[in-house]
UniProtKB/Swiss-Prot annotation:
Chain residues that bind Mn(2+) 1: 284, 417, 456
Pfam families noted in UniProt: AMP_N, Peptidase_M24
Source domain of life: Eukaryota
Keywords: Aminopeptidase, Hydrolase, Manganese, Metal-binding, Metalloprotease, Protease
Biological process according to GO: proteolysis
Annotated GO MF terms: manganese ion binding; metalloaminopeptidase activity
Cofactor binding, note field: Binds 2 manganese ions per subunit.
EC numbers on record: 3.4.11.9
SMART domains: AMP_N
Protein name: Probable Xaa-Pro aminopeptidase ATEG_00858
First-level EC class: hydrolase
Purpose of the protein: Catalyzes the removal of a penultimate prolyl residue from the N-termini of peptides.
Catalytic activity annotation: Release of any N-terminal amino acid, including proline, that is linked to proline, even from a dipeptide or tripeptide
Amino acid sequence: MRAPLSTHDRCLVPDTYDIRLTITGNDGDKYPAKQHARRAAMKLGVSAGLVYLVGQPTINWGDSDQPRPFRQRRYFYYLSGVDEADCYLTYDIHSDLLTLYVPDFDLRHAIWMGPTLTIDEARHRYDVDRVCYFSSLQGHLESWIDKHNNSSPIYILHDTQKPHVPSRENVYLDGEHLLPAMDAARMVKDDYEIRMIRKANQISALAHRKVLENIHRMTNETEIEGLFLATCVSHGAKNQSYEIIAGSGKNAATLHYVKNNEPLHGRQLVCLDAGAEWDCYASDVTRTIPLGPDWASEYVRNIYCLVEKMQETCISQIRRGVTMKSLQDSAHFIAIQGLKDLGVLHDYDVLEIFHSGASAVFFPHGLGHHVGLEVHDVSVQPNAASAAAEGPRQTFFVPMATQSSPGLEPGMVVTIEPGVYFSELAIANARKQPLAKYINFDVAEKYIPIGGVRIEDDILVTHSGYENLTTAPKGEEMLEIIRRAIDN
């Protein structure tokens, strides 16, 4: 049966009849944009208003005709599932109407770059109620403003993303409440999002394993980065969640070392922090790898075993209601006792050392963070500030940690990434601090050639405890892979 399109549908296919027969996946295959929009509205705590989001525009490099690599704005993606440039989105909270605006057809662009997304394609691909061309956006906004007569606001993320309605004055805009509401919504992942993070971790694990199988042949950090990238791309993950960190020797003590261009000869280990992205969702994985069939010295083995203990203990403590602050404190207590046993720290009381901040010379960052659409995903900021204020601190490090909710909830994905580092800069600076009395600098300096050790996994909080989403080999399994590759 053919029926005229309603006014609502004319945005989909203007002035025609919808007489197609299509067989598509069910809505469960689509990114759950409508569910996310409703969740964000619930966090806003209002029953009316218009959410207005601007997608990432096409932008060229400065003084160039070449475009910057496209990366969709994450808040836009969360409410749309659209990974296309130059799109817009509105969500009418009262009428529960989610509308996507796609670029109008441009013949020149289509000839050079291929056609942009059509209304029909977008409607069937995305979980939205209505799809329109961008040329209709201003008129729709004007109609909405006139209808509501400033009784309800247009919610925006930033003042730089205001809607363009020059014909209307004194538009009621709210740029304060949408961002924290969407942050609160994004913290707990739904089943679809967890599948994406799991897939990103699976590809990351393949790439980490490939590096382990070939590390004995490599002579430069560049080769590690290249092989990891190639493996991810060959499995469909063209983007990385962040710049690859492949720091060997002393470079492993630089937390975000990304030059990845130095020779491996004469060095004992490499810290490989690298995670693939899948459909805009991140993974965050770190493995510390020996440059040989075993750890090069007892110094290296001892530090690896200490970090391994820190991670295993903290992961085992994850459950609903536990705070990242308590987990980070636990990691510091283990690090302090371990460094005391190795003679790096003098034999003072563990709590005294903790409160002095001396352990942060060797473990200067947070234990973990949320993972999702960003590798350092959104969280509730007040808790982050309070946790940073309460933890071990000193004057020359600002902890990353505790970008987390007050208590972990099922559906959250967080990293557990303890590390112990021997940074020449940090150790030299520590000599000038009151905390210097807790550190045995003669012993600490013997560990400087190691650089540092970090182990990182992505952990899903569940109703019964946790699930480790990261399957990249570590520990004895990692060593066995390296040995088998050498033997073959």
